[in-house]
Amino acid sequence: NPNYVIEASDKDIIALKEKVVTEFFFEDQNLTEYYLEHKVLWLNSDDRIEEYNKVYLPYASNASLVANKARVIKKTGEIIVLDASKILQAENEETGSKYNYFAFEGIEKGSIIEYYYVEKRRPKYQGARVDIESDYDKQFVEFDLYAPTNLLFNFKSFNLETAVVKDESSTEKLHWQFAVKDLQGIDREEQAPYTAAIGYLMYKLHKNTANNTIITSYNEVAQNLYAFYYPGYTEEENKLIEKFAKKIAINADEDEENKARIIDLYLKENIYISESGNDELK
């Protein structure tokens, strides 16, 4: 068992380890992806404990969960391993889709939760994003990608000094890796594009050397990711957007940059986000 060390800290959460491993290979002549996520989190506040009492596992109709394990390590050193009865399944009443989650018990301030899962899924090779930074400190973060020797991947890092590098010692398969230590958390700020501000990686399948085919460009990657983060609107939503847009006074002769600045200023002066909730607002 690894020996995780925590120095005295007033932080509410610290990631001792976060690791993502994804491997592409051919299974019955079909390209398949196995995706592993492993996290070790030190929790030191009631809010964070409540947040991580349940950890939801990914669900997709074209994927299956092939392995998972979780445990709690208390300050005293006592270890509580989650057995099968603590890996629960729930159902979304609206969509009918089912999902699994870890139901942690016995977490106290200063406890560590550790979990991993392995998912078999349809390969995401036309553009995928891996977040490296978040709103809490991280001691160690790793990313590894393995692929058959004929499939070449491209990588880009954003808001990071470290880049993905190829492991030249790997011969039976291609291997790219990324590792970084001691990352500071990035605070969430109102009206700030948080997902664009944190450090993250993007990767995509670039070339199949078996037939010398270029698979996809970063323009296609950007389109795929944009469609994922900003899905299309309904007809009713489009009408509301058009109605709202008419309130913004923009001269048709303005260039695109000035139009963007005018829209940005209008949104900041007229749109407010409230953290409070009330049934009467529904």
Predicted regions mapped to residue ranges:
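Lumenal/extracellular ectodomains and adaptor appendage modules
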Residues: N1-R121, Q126-D137, V141-E142, L281
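Secretory-pathway-linked proteins and extracytosolic
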Residues: N1-N3, K120-Y125, R129, E133-D135, ...
